[in-house]
Amino acid sequence: MMRDIGLRVQPPAEKCDDPKCPWHGNLKIHGRVFEGIVVSDKPRKTVTVERQYYFYLNKYERYELRRSKIHAHNPPCINAKVGDKVLIAETRPLSKTKHFVVVAVLERAEERR
């Protein structure tokens, strides 16, 4: 059964039996939601997402572009790959470094080229 996770995104077409999936498991999402690009998918069921943001510098009264890397859980039904543009949402701590889960793939790497 597909749950409503509270975000206006298209649910995945595939079904999975992962308990840490927000669509098919019992994982609740809350808090911050980010867009980013997957830079690594080597760990099992984990992706590293890089997001860019602007930071205001008071001294120079200008903005600079910064980036941060976030580890996120990658459910089997979503299966994000390197180069994909994804939407990640905050959740409870899933491991030592994972506090986010991939909710949707906004653009596949093949479509972005």
Curated annotation (Swiss-Prot):
Q: Which superkingdom, per the lineage? A: Archaea
Functional note: One of the primary rRNA binding proteins, it binds specifically to the 5'-end of 16S ribosomal RNA.
**Family, as annotated:** Belongs to the universal ribosomal protein uS17 family.
Signal peptide residues on this chain, from the entry's feature table: none
Q: Which InterPro entries match?
A: NA-bd_OB-fold (IPR012340), Ribosomal_uS17 (IPR000266), Ribosomal_uS17_arc/euk (IPR028333), Ribosomal_uS17_archaeal (IPR019978), Ribosomal_uS17_CS (IPR019979)
Sorted alphabetically, the Gene Ontology BP terms of this entry are: translation
Q: State the organism of origin.
A: Pyrococcus furiosus (strain ATCC 43587 / DSM 3638 / JCM 8422 / Vc1)
Keywords on record: Ribonucleoprotein, Ribosomal protein, RNA-binding, rRNA-binding
What is this protein's name? Answer: Small ribosomal subunit protein uS17
Subunit and partners: Part of the 30S ribosomal subunit.
**CDD domains, per the entry:** Ribosomal_uS17
* Gene Ontology MF term list: rRNA binding; structural constituent of ribosome
Q: Name one GO cellular component term.
A: cytosolic small ribosomal subunit
- NCBIfam families per UniProt: PRK08572.1, uS17_arch
One Pfam family per UniProt: Ribosomal_S17
